[in-house]
Amino acid sequence: MSKHSEYWDTRRDKEIRQTLSELRALADAGYFEGLQPQPAVPEDLKLQSLVAAQLSKGAVFARKVQVLKPMDNPVGPALTQFMTQLLVRDRTEPYKQETLKKFEDAVGQVRILFGKIVRGEIASNAIIRSIVASFLDTFMKDRNLLLNLAAFPQTGPDYLYDHSVKMCLFSLSLASAAGYSRSQSIEIAQGALLADVGMMLIPERIRLKRGKLNEGELFEMRKHPILGLSLLEHVHGLSEAVLVIPYQHHERISGSGYPDSRSGQAVSRFSRIVSIADVFTALTNQRSYRESLVPYQAMLSLLSMGGSGHLDGEHIRQFLRTMSIFPLGSLVRLASGKVAKVVSPNASEFTKPVVSVLTNESGAPLGRFDIVQVDLAASDEKIVEALPHHSITHGVLDGF
């Protein structure tokens, strides 16, 4: 066993112990009661040799990852050193509407962007950088509001573009929590935004199929990392650190991912970050073949995947502390019977976030000016139930 493998195994064992300890504490508090079964990790399905031969560029690129690997450690001043956080009372209605419009516009821009990439009409990464930069400016001063928008379930059959924007935002949050610099965080966010562009080459009858995919369809779907890389290699200005993300974002540090079944340190840290964002986004949004999970359940699923070694436990713990076990934007029921929305995490006590109370004890909605914020770490009030988004009628900006 190499020194790198020994280090990784030791670190993973430590993360598993810490994660299990936290899960036991949550169980003692009664948070696991009534949970749905956790989604199973898909079985590995390797690309057949014929496809691998046809797309040999992807295999060559994969071997280059080992050379690039040292470049994915945090370098330079951490982005968090320059970040602030607006309080609920400091947000104006025009500002909130402008931020929501920026998010919605980005989804439309990604739709256009992906189409142009497929047609070979994108010569440089300027448009990609501009989308990420517009989010970064807001993220630097109001991360909580952006992550609330990302946490709101998508509606409509074609999830690809919405999913890409949300994955970008969650990856940006993970990158900052991991101590990456501004330039590195931008690279991670760019890679996340482009991670699923290869899905554009998957037939819609498969990509949008209602119901579970059969083995042949799953085989076709799992081509998209290599297809995405082949599309993006023609876009000038994308660094190899960015390009590795679309190629590796379905690899798992346990070796159970695809397209190359790479494991441990062979999976770049950038890709591990985006993998977590990808899984969380997928679990919290409805698909044609399943309902979405309550964000709380999705976070528990991530913890389970981190504990089993499928996903990076270190980054999941950082995500937990920046989102809370009841993630930003979640609806929860308090012991008083009131329904509230999570509006800010509590890094030291991740079961006790700051919430905005949206209803009274009987469930009747409160007026806009009657909504109050409660820091559960400094209150006798506590969360007794995580609720799906459709539990009450509310808007994405309510409580913020």
Per-region residue spans from a language model:
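Short, conserved phosphate-binding/catalytic loop or strand-edge motifs used
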Residues: 145-152, 188, 194, 200-208
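Metal-dependent nucleotide-binding catalytic modules
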Residues: 3, 8-9, 284-286, 314-400
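Alpha-helical phosphate/pyrophosphate-handling elements in metalloenzyme active cores
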Residues: 108-109, 157-188, 227, 264-266
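All-alpha helical catalytic cores of prenyl diphosphate-utilizing isoprenoid enzymes
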Residues: 136-140, 157-166, 197-200, 240
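Alpha-helical scaffolding flanking metal-ion-dependent phosphate/phosphodiester catalytic sites
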Residues: 167, 187-201, 219-316, 325-327, ...
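Amphipathic, well-packed alpha-helical segments that form the structural scaffold of globular domains
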Residues: 111, 133-140, 151, 168-172, ...
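Post-HEXXH active-site segment of zinc metalloproteases
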Residues: 206-214, 293
